[in-house]
Amino acid sequence: MDSSPEVALRRTELEREAPIAARSTWIRTRFKGVEVVFLCGTIGAEFDAWQRRLSVTSAADALLSQQIGLDAVEKVMDELEDEVKMKVEGEGLKLRPRRSPGYGDLPIELSRTIISELDATRRIGVSITESDLLVPSKSVTAVCEIC
């Protein structure tokens, strides 16, 4: 399997981005006037294809590959977040830890906004289904608050 990670990010102030803030009451109240960074990372469609091939021959290998994929995409996101954190701290600001849509009280629908705002489908091949699943499956969207 030859797959390199892909990432996209965008720094914005949600108060200036009325269409983004208007999509979610939670976003309007939590991030009003706050600068944020949208993040998206993936290990690519090749991983999904490799995992499908494994599932035909061995359920155990398919299960192990699931964990490998999760660990790999988390590493991609950790590295992207660290890169942004260094830049933000160089400006004398602080980056709060990333939060992904669907965890806690962050609405799952925010993934759709992040994908759109980052143009992630065109830029890195990440899209979202009608039921809000990311494709390729080992992809992550997130938001970090800058303070």
Where are these regions (language model features)?
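Generic detector of well-ordered alpha-helical segments enriched in charged/polar residues
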Residues: 15, 51, 65, 85, ...
